[in-house]
Amino acid sequence: LKGLKNGVSPESPDCLNFTRNYQPTVDAAYLAQAFLRAPKALWEPLDTLTKQRYVTAFKSLRRNKPVYNNHLLFAAIIETFLLKVGEQVDQAKVFLACKKIEEWYVGDGWYSDGPSFSMDYYNDYVIHPMLVDIYQVLKEKKIVSERQYNTAVKRMIRHSDFSERMIMPDGVFPAFGRSATYRTGAFQSLSQVALMKILPSYIHPCLLYTSPS
C-alpha cells in the first residue's frame, strides 16, 4: 500500500510515469485490473488523496490513441475501473474495445489480435482476462447481458484447455509469437479459470501448481 501511495506522490522518487509516451497506458491497465480484482486489498485501504490521484492519472491517459489490436482493451479496462468506482467514464473506449474484440473472435477459444490472426500468447496476456473482467463489471452495472458475459467466460474456458495442453510434463512450454519473454503471463487465462473454479472437469487444479510461473 505504501508503494501504491508513492506511485502517485509527486514528491516521491517512486512516482510513476503517467505522462510520457504511450507505455503508461499499458502499465495503468494492469494496475486498474489489479484494483478491480482485489479492491479490498489494494484499493479500499488507500487514503482519499491517493485514490483521487490515481483517478486523475487514469483519466489523463485518455489523450493516448490505442493501437488497433489488443491495446484497445487497455483503455477499456481503465475506463471500466473508473466506472466501478463511480467516476465519469469514456464509454466509447469501452464499447469500441468490446465490439472489436467480439468481431475478432475466430472460434475455438481464440481471438485474433487485430484484423489479422497472430499465433502468440496475447489471448492470455491480455484478451481473455481483460475482456472477462470488463464484462463482469458491465454485467453488474446492467450494461451487458448475462449471456454476453457467459459467452466470454466459456471462450476463456475453452482457451484454457489449449493452454493446459501446451505445458510439458516437466513444466516447460513452447516459446512462439511476439513478446514470448512475457512468460509470467503466458497462462493467465488458465490461472484465472482455476481461480474462478471453472476449470474443465478433466483438468485438476493440482496439476497446475508445477506449471511455469
Name these PLM-found stretches:
Residues 1-156, 164-191:
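Aromatic-lined, polymer-binding surfaces characteristic
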Residues 199-208:
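Catalytic-core region of carbohydrate-active enzymes that cleave or remodel glycosidic bonds
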Residues 160:
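Glycine-rich phosphate/ribose-binding loops and adjacent secondary-structure elements
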Residues 209-213:
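Conserved small/polar residues in nucleotide/adenosyl-binding loops
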Residues 193-196:
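Loop/turn-rich, solvent-exposed surfaces of beta-rich toroidal or solenoidal domains
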